[in-house]
């Protein structure tokens, strides 16, 4: 077991001693599918790439069956131009034209690289200024500002550290979009594949970029841990929505060498 690796990979373990890390892994981490060294990480990544390729092979030559519906992609980015570049590249590869991007920025540097990367691209986009604060989870509120900009169509969140995992992902998603369905799929993270089983959404088995829904349904992102689950749970509870599951791995982390979304803000 590599104690430094284990602690660096999982934000909730950052203050643990080596002895505490050892105890945690044997009592909880191994059962939760956590990774405790680089060799195990590479094994998991290679295994999950095979699973992803097999699951997604059906849509390699996918021919859409329905007219492209309007999809709004909401992106939070801050001080990560390289991540953002990979994120946008995965959107461009979709070749899906009924698309709007809403992108938040909280400083001038971020605004500059957004505009530099998008101004020569054939994309409909709008940038929205947001303000950071001292709350540890203030970035969740950025989603609320982005949501206010959407007037119609469907919504997908795709932060700057995430990307589409297949070039036909949006075409495939579009064919299953209906007003009363909250559509979910699987997500490829560094240490595991995440997604609800049989459409049963629970804390820890859903990610912010693992679903799509009609924008007429409303919910709110709280500034707290597991805000994506809270947002989804309230959305489903307060609206007459059914959960639909696509058995495909349609989004993934941009960097499979770490786990983002746990207070980690480094670029690639």
Kindly give the residue locations of the regions a language model identified.
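Charge-rich, low-complexity intrinsically disordered regions
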Residues: 1-49
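N-proximal low-complexity "stem/linker" segments adjacent to membrane-targeting elements
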Residues: 44-90
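Short, acidic, metal-binding catalytic loop of nucleotide-sugar glycosyltransferases
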Residues: 89-98
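Glycine-rich, basic loop-to-helix element that forms the pyrophosphate-binding segment
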Residues: 133-150
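Short beta-strand-to-loop acidic/aromatic patch adjacent to the donor-nucleotide binding site
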Residues: 153-163
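Acidic donor-binding/catalytic loop of UDP-sugar-dependent glycosyltransferases
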Residues: 162-175
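Short beta-strand-to-loop element that shapes/binds the nucleotide-sugar donor at the catalytic cleft/hinge
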Residues: 183-196
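Conserved nucleotide-sugar donor-binding catalytic segment
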Residues: 200-267
């Amino acid at each position: 077991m590599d104690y430094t690796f284990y602690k660096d990979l999982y934000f909730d373990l950052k203050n643990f001693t080596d002895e505490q890390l050892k105890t945690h892994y044997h009592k909880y981490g191994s059962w939760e599918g956590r990774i405790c060294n680089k060799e195990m990480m590479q094994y998991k990544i290679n295994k999950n790439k095979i699973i992803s390729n097999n699951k997604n092979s059906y849509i390699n030559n996918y021919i859409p069956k329905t007219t492209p519906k309007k999809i709004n992609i909401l992106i939070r980015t801050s001080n990560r131009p390289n991540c953002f570049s990979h994120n946008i590249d995965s959107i461009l590869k979709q070749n899906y034209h009924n698309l709007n991007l809403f992108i938040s920025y909280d400083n001038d540097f971020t605004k500059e690289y957004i505009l530099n990367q998008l101004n020569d691209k054939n994309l409909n986009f709008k940038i929205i200024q947001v303000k950071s604060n001292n709350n540890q989870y203030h970035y969740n509120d950025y989603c609320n500002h982005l949501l206010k900009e959407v007037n119609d169509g469907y919504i997908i969140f795709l932060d700057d550290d995430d990307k589409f995992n297949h070039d036909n992902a949006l075409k495939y998603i579009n064919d299953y979009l209906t007003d009363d369905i909250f559509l979910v799929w699987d997500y490829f993270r560094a240490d595991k594949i995440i997604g609800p089983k049989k459409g049963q959404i629970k804390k820890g088995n859903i990610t912010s970029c693992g679903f799509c829904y009609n924008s007429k349904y409303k919910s709110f992102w709280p500034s707290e841990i597991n805000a994506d689950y809270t947002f989804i749970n309230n959305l489903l509870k307060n609206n007459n929505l059914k959960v639909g599951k696509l058995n495909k791995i349609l989004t993934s982390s941009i960097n499979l060498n770490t786990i983002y979304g746990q207070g980690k803000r480094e670029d690639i």
